Amino acid sequence: AWDAVHGLSESFQYYLLKASNEIAKEKGHCENFGRTKYADGILPIDTYKKDVDEICSEELQHDWESLRASILEHGLRHSTLSAQMPSESSSVVCNATNGIEPPRDYLSVKKSKKGPLKQIVPSYGTLKNNYTLLWEQPNNTGYINIVAVMQKFFDQAISGNWSYNPINYEGSEVPTSVMANDFLTTYKYGWKTSYYQNTHDQKTDEVEPAHPMGWHDNVEDVGIQGKTRLDNLLEELDNSNEEECESCAI
């Protein structure tokens, strides 16, 4: 998984920079470009925390040196280009998951000014066995590594999160040592900032919050009475035509 994230993140940043450089050739670089590290030919691949290579040691696949030379000559039309933010409001519109955050469940029910909205994870019928739900994760290792590998290439800080399910620990209590280790590990692997520390409250609510860390943008949680409706809905999707749109079906 880390290798795939590494390749995608590298291409993401490389082509963002390449496109901005091409625009700069045509229209000139952005105002105050000289105040950026890019103006000195410094790229994210030069400044990332080298401990990340313990997670993934994949070689770079793009010609960064030619791009560096072109940036030094022509500049960039943008001072920054990449960020990884939660996308809750837009995810409702396009039926997507919330950025890189694991979904809390396959089905969420949210309400907006226009009324309750049912949202199923994308391609549930074909990808249901490939989703890792937030509270099914045994620990934060996988998530920490993914954010670290992405941060290697991004030129803005990613705010990551830690999530804990008490049932995974003796006495249903998350040890302080576990949380401290996660904190130190994120620092070691180059996290710039952290955001929320989530703890599963074991409620039987079958929906994920409007934002996995509790922030609401005109979208609030709506409870579902019992589990039967969810089971019936997912069973219906299992038996539906794969070509049908899950969002439209519900």
Question: What are these model-derived regions, one by one?
Answer:
Residues 208-250:
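Acidic, low-complexity intrinsically disordered tails
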Residues 25, 29, 46, 53-61, ...:
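Catalytic alpha/beta core of large soluble enzyme barrels
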Residues 31, 37, 44, 118, ...:
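Polar low-complexity intrinsically disordered regions enriched in Ser/Thr and small residues
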Residues 1-51:
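Extended, well-ordered alpha-helical scaffold/bundle regions in very large, multi-domain proteins
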